[in-house]
């Protein structure tokens, strides 16, 4: 896993250098150049489940995320935005006195096409869409019943796959060239359930996010 993230980070850095060179050689490129930033915020996450041909969604679970981003200009008003996030997702289920809380944690890399529109010098709107790739690094599956608690690793060998990918849609506003407020939605497309035998079970991540940030 370490080798994978080293390769990804090197690729992002290479894209940054390439974009900087391109932006200096064409009048059509964005003038601001490559920029970096930090992001943090809250998630409202659920799991979409299919079991015995029946589809349902867990109750939502409040969680959080934190990470760093890179903005790479391609053309005027068009950027690629990527980064690396530590993302907490999951959901909740309850039936009678029994409750189950899922809290998987991921390292997540979005690769987004980002359209920008300036409202003078005061604010800039951005609309983002693109794939995300995530790898599970921890988390628990906690069960509560009749006052008793029991927990297990979310990614134990018979439960969930660590790799996840999907689409991210989002929008945000940058104020005074630095301060960011944004919203996004992660639509998981990978079935992260570890099926065995004839099981047709499916589990997919869903997550709404609100982020605050600072762009350098």
What are these regions (language model features)?
Residues 20-63, 124, 215-216:
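Short glycine/proline- and aromatic-enriched beta-strand/turn motifs that initiate or cap beta-hairpins
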Residues 78-80, 177-183:
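Repeated loop/turn-to-beta-strand initiation elements of outer-membrane beta-barrel proteins
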Residues 31, 75, 87, 118-122, ...:
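Outer-membrane beta-barrel channels and translocator barrels
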Residues 46-58, 88-105, 137-162, 191-203, ...:
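Flexible, solvent-exposed loop segments that connect beta-strands
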Residues 173-174, 204-216:
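Outer-membrane beta-barrel "beta-signal"
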Residues 35, 55-99:
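Glycine- and aromatic-enriched membrane insertion/assembly motifs of diderm outer-membrane
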Residues 42-46, 86-90, 108, 117, ...:
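Transmembrane beta-strands of outer-membrane beta-barrel pores
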Residues 32-34, 60-64, 103-109, 123, ...:
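Residues that define the transmembrane beta-barrel architecture of outer-membrane proteins
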């Amino acid at each position: 896993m370490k080798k994978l993230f080293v390769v990804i980070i090197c690729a992002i850095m290479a894209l940054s250098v390439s974009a900087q060179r391109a932006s200096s050689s064409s009048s059509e490129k964005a003038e601001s150049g490559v920029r970096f930033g930090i992001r943090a915020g809250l998630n409202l996450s659920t799991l979409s489940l299919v079991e015995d041909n029946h589809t349902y969604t867990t109750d939502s679970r409040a969680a959080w995320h934190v990470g760093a981003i890179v903005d790479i200009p391609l053309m005027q008003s068009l950027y690629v935005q990527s980064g690396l996030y530590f993302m907490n997702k999951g959901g909740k289920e309850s039936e009678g006195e029994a409750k189950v809380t899922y809290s998987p944690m991921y390292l997540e890399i979005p690769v987004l096409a980002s359209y920008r529109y300036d409202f003078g010098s005061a604010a800039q709107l951005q609309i983002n869409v693109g794939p995300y790739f995530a790898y599970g690094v921890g988390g628990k599956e906690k069960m509560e019943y009749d006052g008793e608690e029991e927990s297990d690793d979310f990614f134990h060998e018979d439960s969930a796959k660590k790799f996840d990918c999907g689409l991210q849609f989002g929008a945000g506003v940058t104020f005074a060239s630095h301060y960011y407020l944004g919203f996004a939605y992660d639509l998981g497309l990978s079935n992260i359930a570890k099926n065995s035998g004839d099981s047709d079970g499916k589990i997919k991540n869903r997550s709404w996010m609100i982020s605050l940030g600072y762009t350098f």
